[in-house]
Each structure stands twice: as C-alpha cells, then as structure tokens.
C-alpha cells in the first residue's frame, strides 16, 4: 500500500511554495510600481503581473517551470 500522507504533504508544500512566490511577485509589483507613477501606470503594471502569473500557471500545465 503506498504512503499517501507523504505524497499529500509534498503536494501541500509545493502549493504553499507556489502561492508564496505569487504573493511576493504581486506585493513587489505594487510596492515598486506605486512609487513610480500615477494610477494608469499602476493598472498597466498590475495587468502585466497578472499575465505573468497566468502564463506561469499555463506553463506548469505543460510541464515547464519558469517561476
């Protein structure tokens, strides 16, 4: 019988790692870009960060790991 608890733990740790990386990217984008310009520029940067995160999720489905 396989040990599913170890598999679940590894999956949970990988999920936390991925989530923490995404949170760091978003926070870094807001902190850095909010000091540079006004609201339209911040919105553009927000959408570019969201596109980056979407692409990283898509690349994971293909088996590629960029982030």
UniProtKB/Swiss-Prot annotation:
GO cellular component: membrane
Protein name (record): Putative uncharacterized protein YGL041C
Transmembrane segments: 13-32, 42-64
Main location: membrane
Membrane topology: Multi-pass membrane protein
Native species: Saccharomyces cerevisiae (strain ATCC 204508 / S288c)
Subcellular location: Membrane
Keywords: Membrane, Transmembrane, Transmembrane helix
Entry superkingdom: Eukaryota
């Amino acid at each position: 019988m396989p040990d599913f608890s170890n598999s679940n733990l590894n999956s949970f740790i990988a999920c936390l790692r991925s989530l923490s990386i995404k949170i760091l990217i978003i926070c870094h984008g807001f902190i850095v870009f909010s000091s540079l310009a006004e609201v339209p520029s911040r919105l553009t940067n927000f959408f570019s960060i969201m596109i980056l995160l979407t692409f990283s999720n898509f690349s994971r489905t293909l088996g590629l790991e960029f982030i």
